[in-house]
A protein has these predicted regions:
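Accessory, non-catalytic peripheral segments of nucleic-acid enzymes
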Residues: 3, 7, 246-386
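Short loop/turn motifs at secondary-structure junctions
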Residues: 10, 55, 167, 198, ...
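His/Asp/Glu-rich metal-coordinating catalytic cores
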Residues: 33, 58, 69-223, 227-232, ...
């Protein structure tokens, strides 16, 4: 660690953000969407366990903890229940409203029942001048989002370091930075905010991948920890929390720690060998896999592809090898040039049907239906032969 060993550390933090509890995954089938939504609660236990494992002094939760300002009670009740189970007394937790769950008069943060359920060591950041004294001569400044969008930099509400102030100063806000192209900027955070406000660590939330902002400045650091569970296929480096060690010289060392169950992956298969290789993988059980198939194969290999799809996805009687599979098989086509040679055992009337369907498959408007019918006749021929 920078500046000495464990004895030199004066403050340890766990920084998390963007839980998005209550998020719905409408592009997935109902049972898959439920599994993904529930996993957003399950990851909280792994986050809190990581805090205990690293013996942190403070847990910072930097906004968008709920996917909307007024989530169903089942979400905020479970947050309170899972926090209460930790039985922490000397490890304060700070919950920051973000732009998805801003501090509004009717929001979850104003819900008296939710507040009463929370342990006394859990603090909601409910004012723009929030300040809290931390152990070992440290202080936290935090600024909540009070609307879904805004053009002001929330760090401007954090007081600058006064002459002679030697405390470890931590900031926590939720918003966008200017280092990502084509990203909608909401509650814009200046890249030099950690410097201009005299902070030793700036904990931020909003984007869903772990990164330093800017990437080449590690001291003092501004950090997005990322969403602890991914929410989309295009996210870069989601699934972590940031564990932060600050030494006597006020230098912060930041370590990402993975807590996610799911890894989201997109894959294209364009050959049977690609598909066979995918099916042999042993790491698919915790994958959310978007699989796109694009190939044209003869009937025996088409049949093999059907079997491999079933192995990946599962059936009503057995689990598939992939945790959650989003399969697009529109690009899988039956090679019809030699399909008649596989149907010689059929009665002549069905062989005549094969020839008609083969001709129909040349028409793009009829191709898909004709190919499925030809495959069915191939299966009939196989059964007859056996």
């Amino acid at each position: 660690m920078t500046g000495g060993g464990e004895d030199d550390i004066v403050l340890k933090l766990l920084h998390t953000a963007d839980w998005h509890l209550g998020r719905r995954f409408r592009s997935f089938r109902e049972e898959q969407a439920l599994k993904l939504s529930r996993s957003r609660l399950d990851v909280l236990d792994r986050i809190f366990l990581a805090a205990e494992r690293s013996a942190v002094d403070v847990v910072l939760c930097a906004g968008d903890l709920f996917d909307e300002p007024t989530p169903h009670p089942e979400w905020w009740e479970q947050v309170a229940v899972r926090l209460e189970k930790r039985k922490w007394k000397d490890r304060p937790v700070f919950l920051l409203p973000g732009n998805h769950d801003p501090l509004l008069p009717d929001s979850v943060w104003a819900n008296d029942k939710f507040r009463r359920l929370l342990p006394e060591w859990v603090h909601i950041v409910d004012r723009e001048d929030f300040e809290f004294t931390l152990p070992n001569n440290a202080v936290l400044y935090a600024v909540p989002c009070v609307s879904r969008s805004g053009a002001g930099d929330p760090t401007e509400s954090i007081p600058t370091r006064a002459p002679g102030d030697e405390r470890v100063r931590i900031g926590m806000v939720h918003g966008s930075t200017f280092d990502v192209n084509d990203w909608q900027t909401n509650f814009p955070i200046a890249l030099d905010a950690v410097l201009s406000r005299g902070l030793d660590y700036l904990a931020i939330g909003d984007t869903h991948g772990f990164r330093f902002v800017p990437a080449d400045r590690k001291h003092p650091p501004t950090v997005y920890p990322g969403a602890p569970e991914p929410t989309a296929f295009d996210e870069k480096d989601p699934g972590s929390v940031a564990v932060v060690f600050i030494n006597r010289q006020r230098l912060a060392t930041v370590r990402p720690e993975r807590v996610a169950r799911w890894t989201w992956e997109e894959a294209w298969v364009r050959s049977v060998s690609d598909m066979r290789a995918l099916a042999k993988r042993t790491d698919l059980v915790d994958r959310v896999l978007r699989l796109r198939v694009e190939m044209r194969v003869p009937a025996p290999e088409y049949e093999e592809m059907e079997r491999l799809f079933e192995d990946l996805e599962g059936t009503s009687a057995r689990h598939g090898t992939v945790g959650i599979l989003d399969l697009d098989r529109q690009g899988l086509e039956l090679e019809t040039a030699d399909v008649e040679s596989y149907c010689n055992d059929l009665p002549e009337v069905l062989q005549s049907t094969v020839r008609r369907l083969k001709a129909a498959a040349e028409d793009p408007a009829q191709r898909q239906v004709a190919q499925r019918a030809l495959y069915h006749l191939y299966r009939v021929s196989r059964k007859k032969a056996s």
